[in-house]
Each structure stands twice: as C-alpha cells, then as structure tokens.
Amino acid sequence: IRMGEIGRVHRHELSGALHGLMRVRAFTQDDAHIFMLPEQIKDEIKGVVSLIDKIYKTFGFSYHLELSTRPEKFLGEISMWDEAESNLKAALEELGLPYIINEGDGAFYGPKIDFHLRDCIGRTWQCGTIQLDYQLPERFELSYIGKDGEKHRPVMIHRVAFGSIERFIGILIEHYAGKFPLWIAPVQVKILPISDKFMDYAKQIEKAMYDAKIRVELDGRAVKIAYNSSVARLEKVPYAVGVG
C-alpha cells in the first residue's frame, strides 16, 4: 500500500536557527508512507531511491547519500535494526550508489537514507529521506494475512522526495540565480511591441502562445522597447519577442 499527501508541517525552530526559505517553522512536505511485506523491502527502497534520483537529475542537482544508523535511544530489538540497516545498504549497493555512514543519526524508530543537495556555493542541504520502520506497525498493531492464512506484521517506509518544498524552491532559485531552465521558468516568453500600433498583433501572438500552453506575458507599456527589453533581461525571461 502506497499512501502520499502534500501536507503542512510545523517545527519549533529556535529563532537563531531560522534561515530564509532554508530553515523555517512551518513548511510544506511531500510525505508518503509505504506498507509492505518484509520480502518487498529491498525492491521498494530501490524504487523510491530511483524516483528521488530522477527528480534531482531532472532539476540539474548533484547530491550525496548518507545512511544514518541506530541512535543511542531507539525503539525495538537490535536484531530488527540490524536487519533494517542491512536492507538499506543492500538496496544502495545494488543500485551502485556511493554513500556515507552517519553513525547514530537514525530516527528513534528506524534507520534512514538522507539525500543532501549541493547548492551553487557548495553548501549541502538535506531534502529527500527514506526511513525504514519496523516499530510503528508494531505499535499500531498492524497486520496482514499471509499465504499461510496467519497474521503477520508489515513493514513501513516513510519517504519524502522534495522534503521541505519551500527549501527546495530556495535551493532552486540560488542554484540557477533566478535564470531557470525554459521548462520551469515562471514566464517563458515576453512579448514586446515596439509601439501601440502593433499592439493588436502582439495580442494575437500572446493568445496563440497561451493556447499552445506557453507561459507568456505581454509588456504593453508605452516606453522604448530598449527599456522593456532590459527589464526582460533583468527578470531573466528565457525569450523576449519584439513585435514591429
């Protein structure tokens, strides 16, 4: 069972730790939980890792992986933790992905894989995470009927790909210095008529582009086109179209 939502999260961050969009007290998160059979763990982890990898590569980000292991205070048996950590390691190794061991930094209920994005000035930010959890299904007394007709305990994965969407947007803005690739630019084309007499034709072009699902704006201000063109450059719009 795979369940996901876009939800609001609140944290009591100390005022000195707050940092723009990167560290806030309330943020939006793409949260998902996957309930599975024990024998499905490795394939599900590999699937989630591949999903997050595809997302980050699409946006042009580099990242590194950290595998966080059992903390000093934890729930459950050590044998369960060892099995969980082994499954995470096996999934990463089968995918051929290098990772760093982060001893003792796992969640209290299970080990995790963290994705750390690198921004344009070399800082790293933890965004995506995959947490393997044997404990909460036990606490909530979850069960399924196996092939043998008996009750068994499922295993759960907590996962986020973007993590804090606000943080991800902040990293994205800094990474591209506002000059986004065409496919994610808020405005893809700006239309600049050179005088009022070309306004009607400029509006026809605007409508044609809008109908073609192009994010377009018409700058019809009665100023010199050189000024409108410089504004478009400052706004880092990928394409400016002069009409005249």
Cite the ranges covered by each PLM segment.
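NTP/phosphate- and nucleic-acid-binding module
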Residues: 1-244
